[in-house]
Amino acid sequence: MNEYFLLPLASLPFPNINPILIQIGPLAVHWYGVGYIVGILFAWWYAKRLAANPKLWPDGILPMKLEDLDDFIVWAAIGVVLGGRTGYVLFYDLPRYIAHPLDIFAVWQGGMSFHGGLLGVILAMTLFSIKRGIRTWSLFDVVAAGVPVGLGLVRVANFINSELWGRPTDVPWAIEFPNGGPFTRHPSQLYEALLEGLVLFVVLRILTHSRLKLKTPRFVGGAFICGYGLSRIFVEFFREPDQQLGYLLGTNWLTMGMILSTPMVLAGIWAMATAKPVKQAQPQAT
């Protein structure tokens, strides 16, 4: 039976939450923007807590000054926005932006790529750590540990916006999205919020505090990119592919998200497999 003609015995109505959290005159604050801002601020706050805890680091020596993280948040925000937008343009809708190049700057119309944002942050992190004399992987570890919270919030905002919904299904928890056509769908945004957000954060928390893996540079960062990649690939089996791309290579299952996430899994496995504990830490903080 064609999945697009399934008639579920029961489904859940869409909660129909206003995508605008606060409206003050012409100024509108959207849940999506709040998710990004709160996510960045939480990652910054959490990274400072990790970097300030001597029990988590080799010989109890902190890997960086807390002021470095205060300065890095600006670099990170720029990397997320520029990388996320550039990634979406290149990976998901290049023909459109070649035909209409000015639309690249119309970020209010939507269109951000996590994979592009990750590359943007990694570039910013590399340049920043070189400038400040910080071990790049240690910076990546503390930043990555708090990122899942922001990922989860943004996916919830995607759900509120009724965007990036899942494939048609007749499972009991299927959702009738207002712009999802005449069939019910997987709430794949919530699947991602659970896996990329809550589950991944808990896993990284265990690694940083119970397994003390911050003493092994790049292990936590590797676990993050591997964990995200695996979560994203899994959810892509339930998520509707981007309309302008559809399924790739003549299949009825392969998506761009899977292709972009596979190298992340491999890179994460490599990072964890080759990570070695620091024998003697170099003082960076006072």
Swiss-Prot record:
Intracellular or extracellular location(s): Cell inner membrane
Record keywords: Cell inner membrane, Cell membrane, Membrane, Transferase, Transmembrane, Transmembrane helix
Protein's pathway: Protein modification; lipoprotein biosynthesis (diacylglyceryl transfer)
Transmembrane feature ranges: 24-44, 72-92, 104-124, 140-160, 190-210, 218-238, 253-273
EC number: 2.5.1.145
Annotated residues for binding of a 1,2-diacyl-sn-glycero-3-phospho-(1'-sn-glycerol): 155
GO molecular function annotation: phosphatidylglycerol-prolipoprotein diacylglyceryl transferase activity
Membrane-protein topology: Multi-pass membrane protein
GO cellular component, one term: plasma membrane
Domain of life: Bacteria
Major localisation: membrane
Example GO BP: lipoprotein biosynthetic process
Family affiliation: Belongs to the Lgt family.
PANTHER family (alphabetical): PHOSPHATIDYLGLYCEROL--PROLIPOPROTEIN DIACYLGLYCERYL TRANSFERASE, PROLIPOPROTEIN DIACYLGLYCERYL TRANSFERASE
Chain's role: Catalyzes the transfer of the diacylglyceryl group from phosphatidylglycerol to the sulfhydryl group of the N-terminal cysteine of a prolipoprotein, the first step in the formation of mature lipoproteins.
Protein name: Phosphatidylglycerol--prolipoprotein diacylglyceryl transferase
